[in-house]
Structures are given as structure tokens and as C-alpha cells.
Amino acid sequence: MTGGFTTVYGRNLVAELPNFVHRPYLVVTMDDLWPRFSTSLDGPGMAAVHRVRTLDVSELEGIVDDLPACASVIGLGGGQAVDVAKFVAWRRRIPLFQVPTAMTVNAPFGHRSGLRRDGIVRYLGYAVPEAVYVDFDVIASAPAGLNRAGVGDILCYHTAHLDWQLTRDLGREEPQWPYDERLVTAAGERLDSVLGALDDIHDVTDHGIHTLMEAHRWGGDTFHASGWNPRHIEGVEHFFFYNLERRTGRHFIHGQPVGFGIVLGSVLHGSGTDEMVAALHRVGVDIRPEAMGVGWDDAEAAMRTLGAFVREAGLWHSIADERPVDDAVVSEVRDRIVAAYGAWESTS
């Protein structure tokens, strides 16, 4: 149904970049990554390195204006780095080369940047990379938790489909996004591929990397290929994540709050909770609030205020519009997660 961006799988790919990207090039990356890759990219062909500090659109506008002249941009990192690289490429109208360093999200394969405006996620801009370079050794060397968390952006298809089917059944479809079984089926194939490779993804084998990144490749591209339609790939589980992020002011490893949201959405729909909890636990994504650096009180507040949040943010229709999160829902979500992962034991 969609081909996605040109994607190159291999090894020693970062060191080759200075030999062919347009010069001078800007590297967009993170503080913790640059020391590792600077020897491969720093040199006479580099215009500058930008270390991402913010995803706020108003701040990024000024940052992009102040960056030095460059002929291309290399996005090197996880979701934040590649999203900012897309934004720079779009604003400067220059070629883009993406190098994900972990499998955390599908951002390297998406056209728009997931940024923040007034604390709410907004997808802005449009950039198509010359290629996405997936280096097996680079990915495998990332913290295992980051790589495993990438399944959140695929397992979320489960709750997204439940939301879209509910919207159809209630006659509340958005005019631009009528229910499309073909999209649901295509997304389901990617979901099944990841569910069938959970052990390889957990161990970050070449097969696990290829399986999850190919699913991300499809997921990142289909938003545009389906006419900017998010309904088959994102729903209430992401809305919970956005609300938790806004309420706490924290940045999270994407798949952890999304994984928690998948459990919440499954409980609200009354469908597939056991399967989703088992998959998240088996692959090694710890969705307990404490593992994210917050408490159960934060998670509970984000659950209970979800209905108000989706209306305030103008998000598309989901189970959050139809079923309030009451004591029974909160208790079931907590019980399911604690039963699978155990109670949190502080190491302090």
C-alpha cells in the first residue's frame, strides 16, 4: 500500500556520511550522543552541530534562524533529534539524511515533526530524507530499554483500531477520515509481524531490528500516504501520553507512557488487555509509572482528566469521549500492570 522512505540497512554507515552528504552539513543530535559520533562527523565539511534542548516551536524558530549556513542536515539520534532535523530541513529547504540511533519511535520515517506548541504535541512541516540509514551495530549498542520501547508505536495500532471502529459504530466519523478496512488490515499486518518477533526485538537481533524498523517505516509513511489520516495508527493510548506529558512537564521514553495508554485503552474498550500486557512485558517495556520517573498519582490524574484533555486539545474521537475513567478503571489498570510487573521496589 505504501513504500516508505528509501531505507538502507548495514554497518559502518555513519562514517560514510561525510563522503557524500552536501557540504557544509549541520548535525542535529543529542548531548549524550555527540561524543560517540564526533570523530566520524566532525571535520572541515561540517558547518556546526546542534544539540537538541527543546521541542517548543517558538523556541525552535529562533534557533533555526541563528544556525549557520549549511547545505544539508544530518539527523542523528532518537525521536527528538530526527524531528528537529526535519524541522530544520523544512525551514531551510535543504536535503535531509536521517540516522536513527535507537528504535524508539517511527519519527525517522515520518514527514512531519512532532513538536510542542503550548505544551501540546503538534505535527508540523514536511521533509523527505534522501535516505534513512539503519546501522545494525549502532542500534544494537543503544540501551536495550530504548530499543524495546519502540514496540509502543506499533502495538498502539490495537487501541487505535478499537477507537476507529467505535467511532464508525457511533456514527461519529470525521468527514475526512471515514473508516477504511484496508488501512486497518494493512496496519494489522505490521502489528502481527512485531508480535511474532517480540523475543528478537527484546534481544535486539538483526532480525528484530529489521522487523521493528520495517514496521516503523510503514507506520511513519502511512500518515501521509493515507491523506494525513492518523486513525489507523494512533488513538487514546497516545492521548494519555500527551496528557501525562503536559501535566508533569516531563519528557518520556515514548513507548513507556504509550504502552501504559495501550493498557488503559484496552481496559476502557474491554478488548485485548491480556494480550497487550503480555506483549509489553515479554518484550521488556516497563510501563510502571515509577519506571518513567513519575508516580501512580500522576498516572491516575492523567487517566481521570483524559476526557477533558482530549476535548481541550481538539483530538479526534476515541473511547475517551465516551467512557469516563472512574475508580473501577483506575483499579483495573493498576491491578493488571502490577500483576504482570510486580510492585515497584525502590533502590534508594
Predicted regions and their residues:
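Solvent-exposed alpha-helices and their adjacent loops that cap or buttress functional pockets
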Residues: 19-20, 65-68, 122-127, 131, ...
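A glycine/threonine-rich phosphate-anchoring loop and its flanking beta-alpha core
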Residues: 90-190
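C-terminal charged capping/lid subdomain of soluble metabolic enzymes
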Residues: 154, 163, 167, 171-173, ...
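A short, small-residue-rich loop immediately preceding and capping a beta-strand
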Residues: 67-88, 92-103
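Active-site segments that bind and position negatively charged phosphate/pyrophosphate groups
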Residues: 179-290, 294
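Short glycine/serine/threonine-rich phosphate/pyrophosphate-binding segments
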Residues: 35-36, 80-87, 105-108, 233
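ATP/NTP phosphate-donor binding region
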Residues: 1-72
